[in-house]
Amino acid sequence: MRKSRKYLLGLLLTGGLFSLSSCRHMEMSNDQWREIIQNIYPVDSIDSQHTWNLLQDKALTVRVKIADPNITTVQVLNGNPYITEGVEILAERPCTTGHYVSPTFKVPNVAPTLYAAAINSDGRYYVVPVDGANDVTIGGSRVINDGTLYQPTYQTFTYLFEEDYPFPGDFDFNDVVMRISQHAANDSTLKLTVTLAAVGATKQVGAAIRLPNINYDYVKSVTIDEGTRFDENYGINRYFISNDEIYSRGRDGSAVINLFDDAHWCMNAKEEMGQVVRMYYNTRKYEAENESAIVPAVSRTYTINMKSNVNAYYQSLALIDPFIIVSNNGLCVEVHTYRYKYDEAIWHYTNGSAGMDDRVPWALLIPDATFHYPVEGITMGMYRDGQISGAYSRYNHSFGQWGRNRSTSKDWWLYENATKAQVY
C-alpha cells in the first residue's frame, strides 16, 4: 500500500466514515463514502447504469443430421478447430444423430465467430459455421471434418481483484489474478479448474468460490484431482477459511468451494521467522530479491459430485462467484465481482448497498483465458479531467471510456488495445 493510500485510510477511519458494530460488521456513511470514491476512482463521471459486464447471452439450436452413428456430443465453439489453435468450448450437450439440442450460453460483448460441432465416441469433430443463425444443422456439404484438429478447451474467464475493498486502492487489478473454467463430465458431475496466475497483494489474501445456483445440500462430495489443496501443508492457523473441508455451506445455503487461506503461500510455500514470505508474484516483469518473483502459475481441478436435483450441463461459468477475503481494519471482508458486490458468502461485515452503490468495481470478470493484466502499480485505465492513461488507454478502445459509457470501448480488454510495456 502506497503512502498516499495509507494517508487516505487514516482520514477514512479518523473521520468516522466507518462505524464498527462488531468485529465482522461495518456500516458506511453514504454521502462521505460516495464523494471519496468519486474523487479517487481512476474514472470520473462513471456511467450511472454501469454493471461492468463484458458478456452477452446467446441461444442456439443445433440439429445433428450426419451418417455417423457414434455421435455423442454437440459443442458450440468460438472458432474452427481445424484452422485455429486456442478454440474454446462455449456450450456442450449430450446428443446423438437425428436429435437436437438448444443450449444457452455467454459470449464476450465483442462477439466471436461461432461454429457448431458434433463429436463422435472416437473424438472426431464434424464442424459447421453458424453464420449468425439461431438454428443450425450439422450435415451436408458444409461439414468440415478433415485436417489437423487443434483440440478445443473449455471457456475460461480471468478474474481480477483489488485487495483494499472497501477502501480505494491503486486499481491495477492484479492483487489476485485467477483464471477459471468449468465443464460437465456427466449429468451429475461438474469439473471446476482454477489457476492462480498472479499475486500482487501486500497482505494475506484468501479465496473461495460460491456456487449460487447449487445448494449445499445437493452436493454429494467435492474432491481435488491433484490430490492436494492449493495451500497444502500451510503451517499457520487458518484465518479466513476456518473450515478445513474442501467445500462448505454459504450464508445463503449455497455450496462454497474453499480454495486457499493465503495466496502468497500458494505461489511460494516459504516461511521466514514464522511468517509467510510476501512478495509480488508475476506482477512485475523482473525479479528483485525479497520484492518480486516470476513463478509458475498454480492450478487445481475440483470434481463436484451432485445429487439428481442439479444437472451439471446447465451450470453457467458466468454465474459462479469467485471472491477473495482480506482483513481491513479488523474486519474479514469479501471482494466480489460487481454482480455480487454486496453478497456475503462466508463473512457478515456490511449492511449491503444501503442505497450508496457508487457503481465502482473492486473485481472484474474478463472473458479471456490469457488476459494481460496491468503490471504492478499501473492502473487498468484512467479517464479524469479529459485525460486518458493507464494499461488500457487506446483512444476509443480504453477502459476509462468504457467506464464513462458502457456502450462504448467495449473491446478495451483485447490485447491489441493494451499498452504492451504496462501489462504482464
Question: At which residue positions do the language-model features occur?
Answer:
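Bacterial Sec-dependent N-terminal signal peptides
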Residues: F18-I46
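Short, ordered, surface-exposed loop/turn motifs in non-cytosolic proteins
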Residues: L55-K58, I66-E88, F173, Q204-G206
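Structural beta-strand segments of beta-rich domains
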Residues: Q56-K58, S188-L192
